[in-house]
Amino acid sequence: MYDLLKTIDDPADLRRLDRRQLQPLADELRAFVLDSVSKTGGHLSSNLGTVELTIALHYVFNTPDDRIVWDVGHQTYPHKILTGRRDGMKTLRQFDGISGFPRRSESEYDTFGTAHSSTSISAALGMAIGSKLNGDDRFSIAVIGDGAMTAGMAFEAMNNAGVSEDAKLLVILNDNDMSISPPVGALNRHLARLMSGRFYAAARAGVERVLSVAPPVLELARKLEEHAKGMVVPATLFEEFGFNYIGPIDGHDLDSLIPTLQNIKELRGPQFLHVVTKKGQGYKLAEADPVLYHGPGKFNPAEGIKPSTTPAKKTYTQVFGEWLCDAAELDARVVGITPAMREGSGMVEFEKRFPERYYDVGIAEQHAVTFAGGLATEGLKPVVAIYSTFLQRAYDQLIHDVALQNLPVVFAIDRAGLVGADGATHAGAYDLAFLRCIPNMTVMAASDENECRQMLHTALQQPNPTAVRYPRGAGTGVATVKAFTEIPLGKGEVRRRTSQPDGKRIAILAFGTMVAPSLAAADALDATVANMRFVKPIDAELVQALARTHDYLVTVEEGCVMGGAGSACVEAMMESGVVRPVLQLGLPDRFVDHGDPAKLLSLCGLDGDGIAKSIRERFLSHAADVASPAKRVA
């Protein structure tokens, strides 16, 4: 099994193969990807769709001297396997294992780290210009998907690239008719009409030379009609940017891919190759449902993904989705917005029930935020469902277009804190720090499912921009209450009180997901625990009261410490004139790698044992002195 694949330890081995061996190699590589992902979990559909393209690129180009930048990067498992990491696939996305995304520190073949969308053309152009300035003669290649082409950054880069006539730059559009959610927008809908009559007539001589090795024009026209729904933008548009447009060609046909790429190597200036692929290619279950198989956990390939038979705790994403539908049913002004993450953000049901108030704006976070601001000016109640890590991409719009005008936009911030297998690129480590410094913002952190629901309701009632952050995955098992209750603005609650005498009284001020482990630590230490709820406005009265009645304060948050929620507590304490020793716990000042979420929290000292250990080491010389019965406040 894998007789050919076992001989490939780097692309130089691949380039020694006869062309007739490449399709059998592709079959082995696809089977290996399926087998590997079924055992570890990971991104599947996208990787099954890039097997032949990956082989062709490494076969034709002299990697790593020629640079390949993979946009988003979750489709790079075939690339990793062919570049010396075949055996490492058993550790994929596990702690101390290989990353699920390109990583410069992992391999010289990973020329640029990616995970967020639409960055590849900018990076590849920088490499191409840098190569030219250094006197090197190498190609820089950006592989970008149809979904990623909806983002403004991709077009900004193409606008810049089009005037770089002597840059050896190739942009490959991997058109697979599927981003994570289906591609949206007018460019998608009208491609066939705009392109079909003009592409060949406008083709330059260089393009015609490349096409001479591809299928005949009539066959291309047939393929164009077949795949029109998945294509993103017309050939004429790319040519207006200054690119030679080539394609579309079948991205699973090595006999088209390889000679086309070989001819492109002889051309100068920016080239644009349009390849049509199919997500899930070669595995019928993934072909039929590429969304289900986008990022599965472990499963049996022979049986496919089976629904769990054990009752699962409700996820925070589900809590949000249910709340949004309930809120929209009660108030016709509620509008839901997602930047291309309908499934991931829990908006599938909302789209079905309220299609006229559902807006998927594509991978366009900047537009999503300003669009929401515009809706708010018309008296609507926009809710932007967005991952914490992707909100970073719209920071100026958040400040300039929403907060500066004090517009009532709700930001439902999913994937706050550590996210596990996706690692540092997707972690929501910074939102508390970068939100609390913005005037007019209200910022809340949910500690359980029902509190999340009620916080979202509270946010919708505010006359200013308001954010509610919540983590990835299942909650604590707390049942949600159907009836809505508005949480008093800027007010936390004491969940447990210490019985320790003066001199040993510790108060833990916990935010969001850190309430539960803080309570566990407090049981071991007999400490007071406050669920702070609000990062902004911070409950200054509660902070100051705890400072007056306790000897030591500890703040705990699942976010960066610098400028975060703990800093808000320290500021409030200092204003009171009562100064106590403070220990601020949170994510370390480094990028936290991928791995099991519970293990990562433990390594960061943010589980119950870790919090207790840090408190003992900082404040308590004799831990046995603080053992006493727990007292919790309901």
Swiss-Prot record:
Catalytic activity from the UniProt record: D-glyceraldehyde 3-phosphate + pyruvate + H(+) = 1-deoxy-D-xylulose 5-phosphate + CO2
Annotated GO MF terms: 1-deoxy-D-xylulose-5-phosphate synthase activity; magnesium ion binding; thiamine pyrophosphate binding
GO terms under cellular component: cytosol
Record-linked InterPro entries: Dxylulose-5-P_synthase (IPR005477), THDP-binding (IPR029061), Transketo_C/PFOR_II (IPR009014), Transketolase-like_Pyr-bd (IPR005475), Transketolase_BS (IPR020826), Transketolase_C (IPR033248), Transketolase_CS (IPR049557)
Cofactor binding notes: Binds 1 Mg(2+) ion per subunit. Binds 1 thiamine pyrophosphate per subunit.
Alphabetical list of SMART domains matching this protein: Transket_pyr
CDD domains, sorted: TPP_DXS (cd02007), TPP_PYR_DXS_TK_like (cd07033)
Family of this protein: Belongs to the transketolase family. DXPS subfamily.
Protein name: 1-deoxy-D-xylulose-5-phosphate synthase
Native source organism of the sequence: Burkholderia pseudomallei (strain 668)
Biological classification of the source: Bacteria, Pseudomonadati, Pseudomonadota, Betaproteobacteria, Burkholderiales
